[in-house]
A protein has these predicted regions:
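Extracellular and organelle-lumenal recognition/adhesion modules and their flexible linkers in secreted
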Residues: 20-194
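PDZ/PDZ-like peptide-tail recognition elements
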Residues: 194-201, 403-459, 544-551
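Cleft-lining beta-strand/loop regions that shape enzyme active-site pockets
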Residues: 208, 216, 232, 257, ...
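PDZ/PDZ-like domain segments forming the peptide/carboxylate-binding groove
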Residues: 217, 222-225, 229, 298-331, ...
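Conserved PDZ fold ligand-binding element
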Residues: 227, 231-235, 364, 460-493, ...
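Amphipathic alpha-helical substructures
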Residues: 237-270, 372-417
Length: 743
């Protein structure tokens, strides 16, 4: 799935787990069981104005199909609606196939398709890279994903419509290893419940209240958080799932909070550790790689004023424990980014109690401590962050405070991949759901109107393209930015300004008072605000998915935009551009499909390295070592012209990875400005209260070992748009690329 906003929104929606009912009627895959004009057993989620109903007139089979249509009066940006059904069982097998018939009418600004998700983060496909557009007759489509029944909690199927138009779905089928799901040959997988799975004692709350926030108490809670996290990822008995480690914290906390002094505190910790079980001696269990890029941070054991016995207990576990599998962790096959398992999200806890808020902080801090490949790149020493945030989390008074606390600590990770992607309901309300009808961005360090989402609102809004906004509701824009900085997690300044620029013109009110400069005249005007669904909003750049991604510019220069590139266009690009003077690849966007190797093969004559990665360790958490990166192979028909790549702050993650690949081409030039500085496959994190975030799960480096995280892809020629260029409608970055090719 390529659309990051769609990834985030899909990850927000949770579904009930496996049930005991397996009858075909309950599955209702043919949509024939209907109540109140809607298929029984299905859920709906998404954003935007859509209607989903049973349709008895247009159908492929039986008496009913399902119709999804965009009912908005205006074209809607970044909206979708999905039909969802959770399969009642977990199944033995190697792969699952979802098939279904789809018919479409005037699908634009998006696509229609099936979708299949295996939770938690085991597999996902929503046909984004091969979605159905336009008007099409009934045709069967399918999705296939590998199964992992041992770790599966839910399997969810469905269909979705992104953007505008109509789609009909009918006659879904699910197969396990080519056998229909209702076949007698299908075997249900019954997962063996471990003690950690069976422990439900604190499902309704921790019953923990923490009132003493003296410096001594905070120091003790910091120590507990570090010991708790160390044991979670190092002790074999915890790793086996023999303990619900969340709830063991709640069992231990009451006596720990009552410890009268450090001696009593340390005795409690030693006894806690000893009661987990014995660990046999191992002479070669913990050998830190000599070439490790990052080594485990264990200095806290020596620097925390611990008793000798407690130090020995921790050091013994570190030296002798061998953990090859962990109930709470695995590394993704083929990619090796961490996958955090069995982390209960406690979605029913709107405002978690003291114990659960402390747990949330401990969980997140330790994940970063042991499995963030970029922990050395934070502005703050991560070792001191835990202590700083203990009073912040425990002093929160409501859900909004809790969300804001997490946004702040996520921000300290300095990763544009990281944000409060799920569960930020009160934060969303605080920022408001009303938006200006125009877009403003930071150009030449000024907040400049760059585009109207809906030109029909220009007359009432008054501001023109190129106008400079200086004040919002009487406050300097610069003052507002400084006050918001801690609530926008990003890797660097470029991505921060990109993200905050949209929300500056967002409010709970129906209008905003603006002071601005227009042709050197200072003006004031109150602009109306609109609901997102009433505007053609977009993030960073516009996409016309129906247009070709490539063209030949004046002067015989090839141009390719990766925003809407399709796999089947790549051979055409190679053939059509073979005699051009140069090629410009525009990655000031997010690639619609993955092109580094298929398109990159056009520009090299031999296997070419362009990247290498660092990976974490299961047996030595906190250690990160280099692994070899892939090579771009030649297709034997190298392009002979010049190659220029365009980047800016909208170039993030896969965009940056792609830019790195093309940068490896001899004499290629990168033109533009600082990219978002967040690359590598993401790892998702569940947090109490229904919150969710992510991190960049692997370290991404150039072959010579230079960092890309936070730094981004550094242009060979630095150029940004100017206010005059914005006013005149010029793409100055593109013009510079043309100049470079012509010279």
């Amino acid at each position: 799935m390529k659309n990051k906003w769609l990834i985030a929104l899909f990850s927000m929606y949770s579904f009930f787990g496996f049930s005991q009912n397996t009858s075909n009627e309950i599955l209702n895959l043919d949509f024939e069981n209907v109540k109140d004009s809607f298929p029984v057993g299905y859920d709906v989620f998404g954003q935007g104005n859509y209607d989903i109903t049973s349709d008895s007139k247009i159908l492929q089979n039986g008496k009913y199909a399902v119709l999804i249509q965009n009912s908005s009066a205006n074209k809607v940006g970044e909206s979708f609606k999905a039909l969802a059904f959770t399969l009642p069982k977990n199944y033995k097998g190697n792969f699952i196939r979802l098939k279904g018939f789809i018919k479409t009418e005037n699908v634009t600004n998006g696509y229609a398709g099936l979708w299949l998700r295996i939770d938690p983060e085991i597999g996902f496909d929503n046909m984004n890279d091969r979605g159905i557009v336009g008007t099409t007759d009934w045709k069967e489509y399918e999705i296939v994903l590998p199964l992992d029944p041992k770790n599966t909690k839910n399997i969810v199927i469905g269909a979705l419509l992104v953007g505008d138009g109509k789609m009909w779905i009918d006659n879904l089928q699910v197969e396990i290893d080519d056998k229909k799901i209702d076949s007698d040959e299908i075997e249900v997988f019954v997962k063996e419940l471990l003690p950690a799975d069976k422990d439900k004692m604190f499902d309704k709350g921790s019953n923990i209240t923490i009132t003493d926030l003296s410096q001594e108490s905070i120091t003790n809670l910091e120590l507990l958080g570090k010991v708790w996290g160390f044991l979670k990822y190092h002790h074999p008995e915890v790793a086996k799932g023999n303990y619900n480690w969340d709830y063991e914290l709640f069992r231990f906390l009451p006596q720990y909070l009552n410890a009268k002094n450090n001696k009593e505190r340390d005795v409690l910790l030693v006894n806690w550790i000893n009661n987990l079980g014995n660990i046999p001696e191992c002479n070669n269990c913990k050998v830190v790689a000599t070439d490790a890029v990052l080594k485990p941070e264990m200095a806290w054991v020596e620097n925390s004023n611990l008793s000798t016995e407690l130090k020995k207990s921790i050091q013994y576990i570190y030296q002798n424990a061998k953990v090859d599998e962990n109930y709470y962790l695995k590394f993704a096959l083929g990619v090796n980014n961490p996958e955090f398992l069995n982390e209960n999200i406690y979605v029913d806890m709107n405002f978690p109690d003291d114990g659960f808020r402390l747990l949330a902080l401990y969980r997140y801090w330790n994940m970063m401590q042991y499995f963030n490949p970029n922990r050395h790149l934070t502005d703050k020493d991560w070792n001191v962050v835990l202590k700083e945030y203990i009073p912040t989390f425990l002093n929160t008074k409501n859900r909004l405070d809790y969300e804001l606390a997490f946004v702040q600590i996520i921000g300290d990770v300095k990763d544009t991949h990281a944000n409060l992607w799920r569960g930020g309901v009160e934060l969303y309300k605080l920022r408001g759901e009303n938006y200006a009808p125009f877009r403003a961005e930071f150009v030449e360090n000024k907040y400049v109107v760059t585009d109207y989402y809906n030109p029909e609102h220009a007359e009432n809004a008054k501001l023109k393209i190129g106008d400079i906004i200086t004040h919002i509701n009487g406050k300097y824009v610069t003052t507002i930015i400084d006050s918001l900085r801690i609530y926008y997690p990003t890797s660097n300044e470029a991505s921060f300004l990109r993200n905050v620029s949209i929300d500056l013109l967002r409010s709970t009110d129906s209008e905003l008072e603006l002071k601005y400069k227009s042709n050197n005249q200072v003006k004031n005007h109150t602009i109306p605000l609109f609901k997102r669904d009433d505007l053609n909003m977009y993030h960073g750049y516009k996409i016309d998915k129906d247009a070709k991604s490539y063209k030949i510019l004046e002067g015989n220069i090839g141009y390719v935009s990766l925003a809407n590139i399709k796999d089947d266009e790549i051979p055409l690009i190679k053939s059509d551009f073979i005699n051009t003077k140069g090629i410009i690849i525009d990655i000031r966007n997010y690639p619609n499909t993955f092109v580094p190797f298929q398109l990159g093969s056009y520009f090299v004559t031999e296997p070419t390295p362009f990247v290498k990665f660092t990976y974490g360790s299961m047996n030595n958490p906190g250690e990160f070592t280099f692994g070899d990166g892939p090579l771009i192979e030649s297709d034997g028909n190298k392009y002979k012209g010049k190659l220029v790549i365009l980047v800016n702050e909208n170039s993030q993650s896969s965009s940056e990875y792609t830019a790195m690949a093309f940068k490896a081409v001899k004499d290629a030039k990168i033109i533009g400005s600082t990219t978002a500085g967040a690359d590598g496959n993401v790892s998702r994190i569940n947090l109490p209260g229904g919150l969710g975030t992510m991190i960049s799960g692997i370290g991404v480096y150039y072959p010579d070992g230079k960092e890309t995280q936070r730094v981004g892809i550094v242009p060979d020629i630095f150029i940004q748009p100017t206010i005059e260029g914005i006013k005149s409608g010029k793409d100055e970055v593109l013009l510079k690329a043309i100049e470079v090719i012509n010279n």
